[in-house]
Amino acid sequence: MQTLYSSIINENMKKTVTLLGDYFFYCFTVLSLITVAGIVFTPAKGFLYEEFIKSLDPKGQKRAIEVFDQKLAAAGLSREIFNPMLLIRKRSRELLVLSDDILVATYPVGIGRATIGIKLNGKDQKTPEGQYYICRKDAENRFHLFLQINYPSPDDAKRGSVQQIIKAGDEERIEAAWESNSCPPTDTALGGPLGIHGFGAESSWTTDGSISLHNIHIEELFWNIATGTSVAILP
């Protein structure tokens, strides 16, 4: 009797689980059809479709690689012979992607709030000037994507040492990072980390010293430019 009773309970439980599974599958199917219908038939279907595609690739990697391949082809280049260098002009607020002497792409940028002059310390809100390289890539940065440059460089450290801005030993630590192709210390009075990131490049957009781009543009840089790439920042 007990065995028969248990069998009936187990059978009822199986039916209940099956019905619940069918119910959730039905609801998921209906919601999916409603979503697709909304994308297809609404006047804003183009916008919704674009947003849907973006949700599948929130950091823009696939699109960025495809678009950059087109820019390389337009410049007569392939990835095999692409030798990237980034040139940033503060006065004209633009970033140029070069391969040797060939221009591949140009992007508008935002720069530090104090727009004129060499960066002297971590609080002056200036974008540094000089020769740097990309020392780190951060895909989880609060500014969408981040390419850290190796500021402060040995030149920045030497200037800071002469002007007694940094402490004894700081210059040596910064020089050691340069020689090992790694990111320099950011705990000195020269500040950092600084780099190239997303979240906007309008003429009124200013930063604490980094270089800002529109998100679609930093995506193109981030997914196509490697660490170690040279970055020249001009007045």
Question: Whereabouts are the PLM-identified features?
Answer:
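N-terminal pre-domains immediately preceding structured catalytic cores
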Residues: I8-P235
